[in-house]
Amino acid sequence: MTKFVVDAGVVLQLASEEVEVSGAHKLLAPTLLRSQTLSALHEAVQRGEIEADVARDRLTRIGKMPIRLLGDAVLRRRAWELADQLGWASTYNAEYVALTQLQADAFVTLDAELARSIEGIVPTASIDALR
């Protein structure tokens, strides 16, 4: 079983495309995933990109995804260290990277710039690896 850390962009795409993740994989994410996906969908509604009922349907699909959410003190401490190491003011992305280091085989993100910035720190995989 391959363990993947998935970020909010990946989860939102999986929900919008109604993709079923292979049962051969285990998905992990920091607890902040809930707030990030909620906010991203609300913002999309406010910008007129999607209807509110579509956003709520995607939130329901996200809530049913078998993603193990983690946010313990060890993760937070490692995220802080990584943010310092990488020169990031925010620890949001560092939480995903830290979780990958601590518990997963690879990190899946749609953010090409983020993926480049963590080369050599954690392995990354494409969203297609989840199918």
Residue ranges of predicted features:
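Phosphate- and divalent-cation-binding pockets in alpha/beta enzyme and binding domains
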Residues: 13-14, 36, 78, 116-117
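Extended beta-strand/beta-hairpin segments
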Residues: 2-6, 91, 122
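Active-site-proximal, substrate-binding regions of enzyme catalytic domains
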Residues: 32, 36-79
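Short, well-structured N-terminal submotif of metal-dependent ribonuclease cores
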Residues: 1-33, 44, 49-56
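Acidic, PIN/NYN-like endoribonuclease modules and their adjacent C-terminal/linker elements
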Residues: 34, 97-131
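Residue-level signal for well-ordered alpha-helical positions
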Residues: 17-18, 40, 120-121
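Active-site neighborhoods of divalent-metal-dependent phosphate/nucleic-acid chemistry enzymes
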Residues: 67-113
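Alpha-helix boundary recognition
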Residues: 23, 60-64, 84, 101, ...
